[in-house]
Amino acid sequence: MSENSTFSTEDSCNSSYKPHASNLRRAGKTCSWASYMTNSPTLIVMIGLPARGKTYVSKKLTRYLNWIGVPTKVFNLGVYRREAVKSYQSYDFFRHDNEEAMKIRKQCALVALEDVKAYFTEESGQIAVFDATNTTRERRDMILNFAKQNAFKVFFVESVCDDPDVIAANILEVKVSSPDYPERNRENVMEDFLKRIECYKVTYQPLDPDNYDKDLSFIKVMNVGQRFLVNRVQDYIQSKIVYYLMNIHVHPRTIYLCRHGESEFNLLGKIGGDSGLSVRGKQFAHALKKFLEEQEIQDLKVWTSQLKRTIQTAESLGVTYEQWKILNEIDAGVCEEMTYSEIEQRYPEEFALRDQEKYLYRYPGGESYQDLVQRLEPVIMELERQGNILVISHQAVMRCLLAYFLDKGADELPYLRCPLHIIFKLTPVAYGCKVETITLNVDAVDTHRDKPTHNFPKSQTPVRMRRNSFTPLSSSNTIRRPRNYSVGSRPLKPLSPLRALDMQEGADQPKTQVSIPVV
């Protein structure tokens, strides 16, 4: 793959359509209005010296965006480099005067960007995170040129850190176990990696918000969230990214998640409602109090929902707690306080629909798991800001929270096993979350329903509906359209019904066209 073929510039715009002059930025004769379309994919470009937490931010941000339903993927340049150079020798590979290595590193960047393009155009990706140092203006300009040619938005995230303790801790926690350093002792790894950082410092050009980079969209994160500098945020997604990055921290803490004690409705097999604790539920609450006292957790906060069963569980702890309405259990609408057998008898169609696509299914007059994720987003933001915390919630709520911390997709989320009287201890680590389950030896009923094993033919899959408004969410016969209009061309006109039918039935349609996802 050559550089010229990767970043070719279109020679002319569509001759049959001449748009009026506008004040939009243009690159040569290329019409660039498409890069400002609201639904254009966004390329997040990380910037910073090694050991500044770029990969930590990349993975965490990707996990959050996927959780809220925005298809996102990380492209780590280190992975591409290790594919190209199988054996890492020393920091000499990163010297700016090592011409052969510089060519390899640039070629790896080009290959990664081509994969970004394929992800956007062929896999319906919405956001790609380009995880690399990108410390020179030359490299960043190359990325900007690539994005303009393909009508992608660009948002830079620069991580700046001058705290030697933070840098050293990052090297020891993450880099010692890096594939670059197999079977090496810590002292040698630290020495080599510090020299690698010095190689990057020679050519490092930070973002310049006052002059050279004043027109770019970016956020500078200084000393792991001590200060922030935000410049020219373009859209809703970028504002959400900024808000998220301003809430996360890296201080050690533990998050405890558990459901309320067994309730009277749990014993009857009923869903929803606002029943109190059973005898065994009260036993669990006392066992939970004893467990927390033994742990001697400093400055522990306790959150509950506003439903009776979580409040009664927290009351037994003898500590201050906060009630959150948004932690209430999923709203089952007309099915509240019914057993699954009763739902199947009274609403057989609804029962079958929920089994087909549990994440998207919305109870009539109630909520779906997708709705619940949106409702819980403020909880995630606050959890990211907190220290040690215990959240006493409900089965569906706990599934959503666990899916965020464990990076589980929409298919897995509604079927995560969250038993009664089990505590999940989550400890954030470098690139993920360590999970421990703690049993307090108090019996309880099993409220888990496994995923149905039967498969429905696509021809039998109904149109998904908003159950309380009967507004279609999507059609099983989606008309496929190009992800983005080609640069310089007239936006496609709406299809007539006959033409739409032709497109659905025709066998000669382009294979690379994809439907436009709604975010």
UniProtKB/Swiss-Prot annotation:
Post-translational modification Phosphoserine, affected residues: S32, S469, S486, S496
Record PTM N-acetylserine, positions in chain: S2
Region (6-phosphofructo-2-kinase): 2-251
Residue positions binding ATP: 48-56, 170-175, 351-354, 395-399, 431
Record carries keyword rRNA processing: no
Modified residues (Phosphothreonine): T471, T478
Family per similarity comment: In the C-terminal section; belongs to the phosphoglycerate mutase family.
Protein name as catalogued: 6-phosphofructo-2-kinase/fructose-2,6-bisphosphatase 2
Lineage: Eukaryota, Metazoa, Chordata, Craniata, Vertebrata
Gene (name only): Pfkfb2
